[in-house]
Amino acid sequence: MSDMERTAVIVGAARLPTGRFLGGLSPLKAPELGARAIAGVVERSGVAPADIQDVIMGNVVQAGVGQAPARQAAIGAGLPAEIPAMTINKVCGSGLKAVMLSAQAIRAGDLQVAVAGGMESMSNAPYLVQGYRGGVKFGDRSMVDALIHDGLWCSFGRCHMGGHAEYTAWKADVSREDQDQFAYESHMKAVAAIDAGEFSAEIIPVEIAGRKGTTVVDT
């Protein structure tokens, strides 16, 4: 097989709107969000679902989402049940690692067509009560926030991941003022791009059914 035949290419790409914590997308768990993303990108790409050979999806905070999140997303998207699926947890790099693994498999000749991406719902991260399975014999027992414990807390440094970011900024001599200015400019560019409709082609609108009707989240 030639190098050209082993080249991995992206034939379709799409994303859901960017949500906020406890915002408009919060009624949907990560696999439900993933299902909508997969269904949308498959439709836009023109790839026949039966031609897809694997689904690889990144997902960090998996507590409470149910067994096999990537497979839930694939089935929820209407893909054939025969297609295997794998969930990847590489913290913030989970979704991109899923894409990398798919590309590696294609270059190796193991796959021809794959769906890859990431899905997350920080709003749906549960609170955990540890130690109750064996029973609490004496004293208090606190709840553990899975969002922090599984997603934002360094297992090795025993600190918030934001602390590592501050340390990295300090080592690179990036001031707080520089960070704030960069963040401000980034937000302003995003607002301008949204207003100009620059993101419309890549976003899959999400419909949320509620007591007051259906809400469409599209930015």
Q: Where is each model-derived feature located?
A:
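Condensing-enzyme catalytic core mediating Claisen C-C bond formation in acyl metabolism
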Residues: 2-30, 40, 170
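N-terminal extracellular/periplasmic Venus flytrap/periplasmic-binding protein-like
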Residues: 14-16, 27-28, 33-36, 44, ...
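Short acidic, glycine/serine/threonine-rich loops at helix termini
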Residues: 21-23, 67-68, 124-130
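N-terminal beta-alpha supersecondary unit
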Residues: 21-47, 51-64
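Short, well-ordered amphipathic alpha-helical segments that serve as non-catalytic structural scaffolds
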Residues: 30-46, 69-73, 98-101, 161-168, ...
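Conserved catalytic cysteine-centered active-site region
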Residues: 59-114, 155-161
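Active-site-proximal alpha-helical scaffold in enzymes
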Residues: 90-120, 163, 169-198
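Flexible glycine-/small-residue-enriched beta->alpha junction loops
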Residues: 113-167
